[in-house]
Amino acid sequence: MDIVEIIKAIILGMVEGLTEFAPVSSTGHMIIVDDMWLKSQEFLGKYAANTFKVVIQLGSILAVVVVFKDRFIDLLGLRGRHRDGKPRLKLMQVIVGLIPAGVLGVLFEDYIDEHLFSTATVLIGLVLGALLMIAADVFAKKAPKAQTVDQITYKQALIVGLVQCLSLWPGFSRSGSTISGGVLVGMSHRAAADFTFIMAVPIMMGASVLSLLKNWQYFTIDALPFFTAGFISAFLFALISIRFFLKLINQIRLVPFAVYRIVLALVIYIVYF
């Protein structure tokens, strides 16, 4: 494996890291960067290339764990009980938010992989996701009941979990759907974003590990440098992206991302159709 292919791995990791947790659809960006330009399937093969995308997604997940490490320590009860009387996000609220998409994902995984992963379906997801995000900003409550993630209710967690099911459609965007759902049920943009990232870790980790176990044979000595470079790149760029996004989301809200998604959909449409 030569240096050019390692550079391609770094670029793909960068795209994954920058877009996985922003509400812009990492799938749509992979179509443009990989399918249209870098073409990893040509030198890795179809299944190894798909395994590589799972590996770099794990890099992005690790970045979330690093950014929210204190939160996960609290959720797992590793600090002991807090005695200040303040409300705090509970592990059970996260589980409630995970159940709907988790169940549907397991039931329809094969159908989604076989029938919904196409350029046309991603285009539809990009546009419909953008419309949902615009609606969320238009109808957002002026004084959200949950200003922080510690103030969300079980009902809000469940509704966000139900809306997250939309992200099973490729191109819709997990963060786009869940942040929109959170805003529509009375969370601030930052609270919804925090809850989105926290929920993403177990559901994405589970899906990624299962996929890797199914495709372990593609971890060859030849592919290892490519996989490693992509993983590290995705991790580093996801760290940057997550921290930047969380600082700005309450100010810029969702409409700018929605406009960007529509432009991206137009670019893909012009190139492919």
Swiss-Prot record:
Catalyzes the dephosphorylation of undecaprenyl diphosphate (UPP). Confers resistance to bacitracin. Bacitracin is thought to be involved in the inhibition of peptidoglycan synthesis by sequestering undecaprenyl diphosphate, thereby reducing the pool of lipid carrier available. PANTHER family: UNDECAPRENYL-DIPHOSPHATASE. It is found in: Cell membrane. GO terms for cellular component: plasma membrane. It comes from Geobacillus sp. (strain WCH70). One of its GO terms (biological process) is response to antibiotic. Its main location: membrane. This is Undecaprenyl-diphosphatase. One of its GO terms (molecular function) is undecaprenyl-diphosphatase activity. The lineage of its organism: Bacteria, Bacillati, Bacillota, Bacilli, Bacillales. Belongs to the UppP family. It is a multi-pass membrane protein. InterPro entries: UppP (IPR003824). Its EC number is 3.6.1.27. It holds the Pfam family BacA. Coiled coil: none annotated. It catalyses: di-trans,octa-cis-undecaprenyl diphosphate + H2O = di-trans,octa-cis-undecaprenyl phosphate + phosphate + H(+). Keywords: Antibiotic resistance, Cell membrane, Cell shape, Cell wall biogenesis/degradation, Hydrolase, Membrane, Peptidoglycan synthesis, Transmembrane, Transmembrane helix. The chain crosses the membrane at residues 3-23, 48-68, 92-112, 116-136, 152-172, 193-213, 220-240, 252-272.
